Amino acid sequence: MSQPPPEPGPVRRRTVRRRAIVPGQGRGPGRWSQRLPRGARGADRDGFAAFLRAETTGGLLLLAATVAALVWANTAPGTYHTVWSTPAGLGPSWLHLADMHLTDWVADALLAVFFFTVGLELKRELTLGTLADRRSAALPVAAAAGGMLAPALLCLALTHHTPGAGHAWAIPVATDIAFALGVLSLAGPRVPPGLRTVLLGLAVADDLGGILLIALGLNHGINPAWLATATTLLATTALAHHRRWTSPLLHLPLAAAVWISLHAAGIHPTVAGVALGLLVRVHPDPDEPEAPATRLERHLGPINAAVILPAFALSATGVSLTPHALLHVATDPISRGVAVGLLAGKLLGVPAGAWLAVRLHLARLPDGVRWRHLVPLGLLAGIGYTVSLLITRLALPDPTAVDGASTAILTASVAASALALTALRSPLATVGAPATRGSSRPATQVGGVAGPIPQTRRESDGGPTGGQEPPPARVRRAPPASPHPR
């Protein structure tokens, strides 16, 4: 009698161990290294880019460049002014680029790239973000309106009888996004998350107001022919975006032509960056992993933080900090008006604008934000650095007045940063905004228990959540009481 065949056992798979390849040793990167996941291949590169995109990093790099410029200008002023006054003219005279200097290229060309990113952010906020909903946008817009009107009126009241004041009232209307968000991030995770949203919307609206001032009020005669050329080129760029012509070989020459046309038209060419940024799509197509605006923001963020803003700070902050210069800020009407407008005007105007919008039932305070938080918000808005320095160069005709106003901007911004950080870390500002231990994410009160704010999968990428609510927390039930107590 034959025995039944044995049952087949489990199939054993042979595990092949692949030797890790270290660059510079053995065969070098080959086909096995190409099979590594994308995150393993570019972890260092992506991590460094994310480090540069962080708000704290941008603020610290901007601060380091400012300190370097001050040290350079106060220890070797001759060398500083010689370097940045180096002639760097380019092209024929009819392009109006032949008389430019090195500092002009930084303020006009490099800052145009930064304002292109501002245009991308503004387009996203107007379409998908805080400014897309009327009630959500009303609070930061009203706060920004008050924060622009009060500083302008204070500065105008202190300088309207001063000869050479020009358009000095326009200098303290702007808020520096990089510095303000950097100072806010230094306050730690106990600050209410809604305060950052309001500050971002306020800074974007402030920048929009500063851009309109530059475009409409601070130009020196407009050439209609060049303006028509720039308008035609912008229309061509809009058509290219609409037809999905995304090649850099098309868009880079178009952007350069728009910049040259606006510069020749008499409008500050940084407006070209904002206009081009507003034309980029913020909604991805079905076959695109992300929108073009999101991709450009991700690529340009590290360049802005590491190159453009520090270079502008290095070229524009070379002011004297001698006792005579600091005394000049307190005695000169223009410098005093700029400093008072930034520090006191923002502190009064931002809370007043927000209060008026809430009282008129046009807006409401975000969750977790109380009236006491509007005081540090007004102080953060008083950090007017990048755009204020740019407006100073355009608003004041006298170089001596430009140096005095730049010193006033620096002094007021440092004072506003210190006061805002102190106010944000005070117990009054952090009441009602507890933080989770060991985590940098803000916390919220859920049923009287502090816990991290739930995030959906797409929230971490900055995208919409699709209206999905987070899953309810699992509640652990207590075991039933024993019928036979001991």
Swiss-Prot record:
It is a multi-pass membrane protein. It catalyses: Na(+)(in) + 2 H(+)(out) = Na(+)(out) + 2 H(+)(in). The chain crosses the membrane at residues 58-78, 102-122, 138-158, 168-188, 198-218, 220-240, 260-280, 300-320, 338-358, 374-394, 404-424. Disulfide bonds: none annotated. One of its GO terms (cellular component) is plasma membrane. One of its GO terms (molecular function) is sodium:proton antiporter activity. The keyword ATP-binding does not apply. One of its GO terms (biological process) is regulation of pH. It comes from the Bacteria. InterPro entries: Na/H_antiporter_dom_sf, NhaA. Keywords: Antiport, Cell membrane, Ion transport, Membrane, Sodium, Sodium transport, Transmembrane, Transmembrane helix, Transport. Residues 432-486 are annotated as: Disordered. The keyword ATP-binding does not apply. It is found in: Cell membrane. Belongs to the NhaA Na(+)/H(+) (TC 2.A.33) antiporter family. Na(+)/H(+) antiporter that extrudes sodium in exchange for external protons. PANTHER family: NA(+)_H(+) ANTIPORTER NHAA, SODIUM ION/PROTON ANTIPORTER NHAA-RELATED. This is Na(+)/H(+) antiporter NhaA 2. It comes from Frankia alni (strain DSM 45986 / CECT 9034 / ACN14a).
